[in-house]
């Protein structure tokens, strides 16, 4: 079953732009945060779809399980990922030949924790060691803070190349200074 999103719904704020200054910061630091990326209407619509998905799959659903909404026939999700502004961001990072390789909807219920160890996404998606460039993005549909799941990044670590998990785990605290961003629903985190 395909669930439609209103085609006239404004998805992305008009103010969103990934210009030269944003690109320069991204290249240097390995991430960029866009406040209020999604419109309030898109957040509300997305939440209603997310609530429906969780309710439909509640039987046997673990509180922190990931799902791939684009593979569930969720057109609203596909519409966000293929919005021209999102594609422009990805094209500036990767070039014109783009593939939506992987997408997750992660449900974190109140009181149900799920830690994710430090890692490089390239290790998961590039098993053939091709070193294909990646552009990751994360859009929370709820406000997040240090108590319920911020995204933590290690600035400039993308310049270290592909590291073994043992190297990442062994890095001392001084070398592994992270940026833990508090985010509002609808913000956009782009990272390498």
Task: Map each language-model feature to its residues.
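Non-heme Fe(II)-dependent double-stranded beta-helix
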Residues: 1-29, 34-129, 166
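Double-stranded beta-helix
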Residues: 6, 147-192
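Short, conserved beta-strand element in jelly-roll/cupin
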Residues: 93, 119, 126-146, 182
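Catalytic cores of transferase enzymes with a strong primary signal for eukaryotic protein kinases
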Residues: 13, 22, 59-63, 132, ...
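Hydrophobic side chains in beta-strands
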Residues: 107, 139-140, 153
């Amino acid at each position: 079953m395909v669930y439609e999103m209103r085609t006239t719904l404004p998805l992305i704020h008009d103010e969103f732009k990934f210009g030269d200054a944003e690109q320069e910061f991204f290249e240097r630091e390995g991430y960029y945060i866009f406040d209020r990326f999604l419109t309030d209407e898109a957040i509300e619509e997305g939440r209603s779809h997310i609530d429906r998905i969780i309710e439909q799959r509640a039987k046997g659903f673990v509180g922190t399980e990931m799902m791939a909404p684009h593979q569930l026939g969720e057109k609203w999700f596909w519409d966000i990922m293929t919005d021209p502004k999102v594609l422009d961001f990805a094209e500036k990072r990767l070039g014109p030949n783009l593939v939506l390789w992987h997408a997750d909807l992660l449900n974190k219920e109140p009181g149900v924790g799920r830690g994710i160890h430090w890692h490089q996404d390239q290790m998961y998606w590039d098993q053939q060691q091709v070193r294909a460039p990646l552009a990751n993005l994360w859009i929370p549909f709820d406000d997040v803070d240090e108590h319920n799941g911020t995204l933590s990044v290690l600035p400039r670590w993308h310049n270290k190349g592909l590291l073994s998990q043992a190297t990442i785990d062994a890095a001392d605290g001084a070398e592994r200074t992270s940026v833990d961003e508090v985010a509002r629903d609808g913000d956009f985190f782009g990272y390498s």
